[in-house]
């Protein structure tokens, strides 16, 4: 009897993602295969799911889009791809998703969501105003013989 329940749950996993191809796609991209109810989709194409049978902290998740702001994100998924309005719901700061209760507009939130630029040439590097404790040695300049 328990074997039948495991097989039934496995078939639900495969059929819930659109067949074997969709199942493998989600498995390789997210390293986790879960089935839940679709709560909503943001303007970039990220899909947000919820399953209250899971324990707290793993009952809400996102399936990221394959392209965002002109960048191919199929294998390059980043947590900064979640817009602020969905971040509130995803991290359980609110029970109402933005599809039910839209958040209030804030002037510090961008209209077009940006990626995390850390580790790229566009990253923010603050100017250092303190003097170095150790200075680099500069060899005396002599002509090469």
Curated annotation (Swiss-Prot):
InterPro entries: NDUFA12. The modification N-acetylmethionine is found at residue 1. Coiled coil: none annotated. Belongs to the complex I NDUFA12 subunit family. Keywords: Acetylation, Electron transport, Membrane, Mitochondrion, Mitochondrion inner membrane, Respiratory chain, Transport. It is found in: Mitochondrion inner membrane. The keyword Disulfide bond does not apply. Complex I is composed of 45 different subunits. This is NADH dehydrogenase [ubiquinone] 1 alpha subcomplex subunit 12. Accessory subunit of the mitochondrial membrane respiratory chain NADH dehydrogenase (Complex I), that is believed not to be involved in catalysis. Complex I functions in the transfer of electrons from NADH to the respiratory chain. The immediate electron acceptor for the enzyme is believed to be ubiquinone. It is a peripheral membrane protein. It comes from Bos taurus. One of its GO terms (cellular component) is mitochondrion.
């Amino acid at each position: 009897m328990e074997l039948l329940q495991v097989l039934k749950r496995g078939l639900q996993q495969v059929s819930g993602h659109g067949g074997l191809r969709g199942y493998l796609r989600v498995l390789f991209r997210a390293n986790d295969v879960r089935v839940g109810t679709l709560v909503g989709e943001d303007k970039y194409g990220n899909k947000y799911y919820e399953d209250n049978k899971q324990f707290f902290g793993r009952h809400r998740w996102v399936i990221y889009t394959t392209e965002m702001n002109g960048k191919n994100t199929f294998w390059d998924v980043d947590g900064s791809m979640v817009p602020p309005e969905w971040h509130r719901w995803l991290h359980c700061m609110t029970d109402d998703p933005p599809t039910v209760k839209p958040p209030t507009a804030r002037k510090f939130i961008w209209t077009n969501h940006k990626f995390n630029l850390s580790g790229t040439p566009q990253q923010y590097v603050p100017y250092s105003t303190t003097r170095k404790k150790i200075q680099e040695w500069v060899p005396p300049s002599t002509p090469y013989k």
